[in-house]
Amino acid sequence: GKTSLLRLLCGENIPHTGTVACGSRLQISHVQQDPSGLRGDLSAYAAQHGLDESLFKAILRKLDFARVQFEKDMADFSAGQKKKVLLARSLCEPSHLLVWDEPLNYVDVLSRIQLEELLLEFQPTIVFVEHDRVFCDRVATKAVTL
């Protein structure tokens, strides 16, 4: 249910009833629950997604990414490291709205705190599904409980 709602917000054509309307120029950056499937190095990934590579890597550093990881193949990353790549990408992408599905899945406690600090610093408009009440209370300005 919650994931389907986020997918509809992102414009995916999935079976539903009712109407979902988003502005035609609305730019959304979506992070899915599952971080698998990432391959290649971070520089190529940044280029592929049109990201400012230095900003992208700076955000990864703020998420406790070691510099040695920058040269490795993402296929060898842990699920938590892959999730950080997706979150950093989303924070770098030009968008009006971030839509994140369980951003803390696979992320260790220290990185949760660092992500919280990044969100408080960047203050993006974000819709997210998350089960960690403390995180939600600290970063959300409004909440809908489903």
Predicted regions and their residues:
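ABC ATP-binding cassette signature C-motif
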Residues: G1-L146
